[in-house]
């Protein structure tokens, strides 16, 4: 799967808005070119888009997130929140234990599901250059993350219940 295909897959989910950061968004310049998927069935805009349920990152963030080596041609990373329970089923240990288990993972491996190099302790997972080896799992995790985002949205009473001014970035 290439980046455009992954974004099309995400956009096909009901109630989803995908924002690609750029000069016309509130995103910091370092995030320009990266895409963020939000469950926003009312298309209420930035106020409703606090936390993405999926991100597609196209470059390393120097000094913060470089372990995936995203500077390689055509390489990007899909990030998804699996949650503690699913993360534990996937990797055999809870997200809180990732600090002690980091050496077990090649965060720059292509087409392999790994804990997110920065947000793994919060239950996020990632795949650098998803392809045939991870496609089924990516689709399942994407559906899982989308459903969790939908449930969170419903619990909060939809976009109207969330009137804070802070941006989702």
Predicted regions and their residues:
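Charge-dense, helix-prone N-terminal extensions
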Residues: 1-169
């Amino acid at each position: 799967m290439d980046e455009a295909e992954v974004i099309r897959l995400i956009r096909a989910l009901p109630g989803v808005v995908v924002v690609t950061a750029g000069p016309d968004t509130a995103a910091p310049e370092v995030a320009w070119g990266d895409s963020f998927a939000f469950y926003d069935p009312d298309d209420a805009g930035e106020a409703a888009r606090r936390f993405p349920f999926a991100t597609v990152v196209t470059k390393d963030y120097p000094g913060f997130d470089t372990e995936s080596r995203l500077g390689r041609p055509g390489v990007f990373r899909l990030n998804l929140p699996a949650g503690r329970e699913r993360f534990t089923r996937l990797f055999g240990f809870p997200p809180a234990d990732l600090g002690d288990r980091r050496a077990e993972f090649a965060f720059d491996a292509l087409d392999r599901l790994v804990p997110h190099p920065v947000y793994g302790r919060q239950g996020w997972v990632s795949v650098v250059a998803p392809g045939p080896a991870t496609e089924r799992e990516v689709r399942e995790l994407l559906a899982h993350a989308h459903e969790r985002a939908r449930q969170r949205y419903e619990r909060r009473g939809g976009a109207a219940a969330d009137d804070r001014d802070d941006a989702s970035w």
